Amino acid sequence: MAVTTRLTWLHEKILQNHFGGKRLSLLYKGSVHGFRNGVLLDRCCNQGPTLTVIYSEDHIIGAYAEESYQEGKYASIILFALQDTKISEWKLGLCTPETLFCCDVTKYNSPTNFQIDGRNRKVIMDLKTMENLGLAQNCTISIQDYEVFRCEDSLDERKIKGVIELRKSLLSALRTYEPYGSLVQQIRILLLGPIGAGKSSFFNSVRSVFQGHVTHQALVGTNTTGISEKYRTYSIRDGKDGKYLPFILCDSLGLSEKEGGLCRDDIFYILNGNIRDRYQFNPMESIKLNHHDYIDSPSLKDRIHCVAFVFDASSIQYFSSQMIVKIKRIRRELVNAGVVHVALLTHVDSMDLITKGDLIEIERCEPVRSKLEEVQRKLGFALSDISVVSNYSSEWELDPVKDVLILSALRRMLWAADDFLEDLPFEQIGNLREEIINCAQGKK
């Protein structure tokens, strides 16, 4: 049976971030391996930097060793106390592991201001140490349990290699993707969501990955009315002079609960393929049928094959009841129209305590999982239909971890679009295939 830590996710993240963003790997647990400090040192010496966490009835305290414990050798020790979400620290200074853990106080000089006595299940501190750590003035703390962790890099060489391989695999899959039944050459994905959610940034991020450097073709910003005021359909080249990829990302004016956002009627003109690229939206009224950017008889290739609702992960909790009602109403109308849709959570890297290491297994991350459940609860999306990304915003260089999230989300959208194409009425598919065959024969 695997040995697990007593730390909550939140407390573990606070400690990780406080001590250099390291990943904590459990080496020793008193309640499992025994409260014998000699055994502790046998397991924990020569392991690199370590973090000892002590649990009492009222406190979580401990010691961080910046260097590896070695028998008889001094290491720099930092003491800490964790209370709720606040952490305080005090530098104990140089100390041998034997004296810190009360293993042989006769052979080495014993510090009188802090000792961990596993055999008697207590921590001994002087008043000054208690005061520096912000603890109540009680010189002895009973130990319920204690754990020692090895502090490792959150992204070791093995993990980085795995991320790079996954990125390579995703790029290959997206480059060679073919829409279901060859009914269209390019899938059209509409990015829809509140103003400032990150729709244009997601397009820029996708383009950046395929261009091999960070790009900003679509303007982004934080205006309350949004930056995107035109309908844009973006084809993306594979590299600077490469062929166009088999998908088009469509950007639009953001949704607003008040005046200034995208008209609901315009959404369905977009879905049906009636609106041309670069149409200037009018927030007060939808497109007129006699407008020069209105397409009278759009074909399947002009239609939207998947809608991706884009939400800022840090803003979901602040959605007004009007915004929630608007999104739910649009979703119902999409379902009635047979249009598949997914959700995209952006800005997850700006959430509290999220580290780069968390982005590798982002959906296992507790705060992100909580956000996914919030989207499910408030807006009705299935958890399996929600992707998580970290867009490029201020970075100068590409990051393979971010790339994997972006490419995975895009692949999920293409899978959803295939579902839409496969679900088209049989008669419509038959007519389309006949048109495709006739067109191909006419080119010969």
Curated annotation (Swiss-Prot):
Give the GO terms filed under biological process for this record.
Answer: cellular response to virus; immune response; response to bacterium; response to virus
Q: What keywords were assigned to this record?
A: Cytoplasm
Q: What is this protein called?
A: Interferon-induced protein 44
| Ranges where the TLDc domain occurs | 1-152
Task: Briefly state the protein's biological role.
Answer: This protein aggregates to form microtubular structures.
Q: Name the major location.
A: cytoplasm
> According to its UniProt record, which protein family does this protein belong to?
Belongs to the IFI44 family.
Which PROSITE patterns does the protein's record reference?
TLDC
Localization: Cytoplasm
Lineage top rank: taxon: Eukaryota
Which InterPro entries does the annotation name? P-loop_NTPase, TLDc_dom
Q: Which GO terms describe its cellular component?
A: cytosol
Kinase is among the record's keywords: no
User: What does the entry say induces or represses the expression of this protein?
Assistant: By alpha and beta interferons, but not by gamma interferons.
Record flagged with keyword Cytoplasm: yes
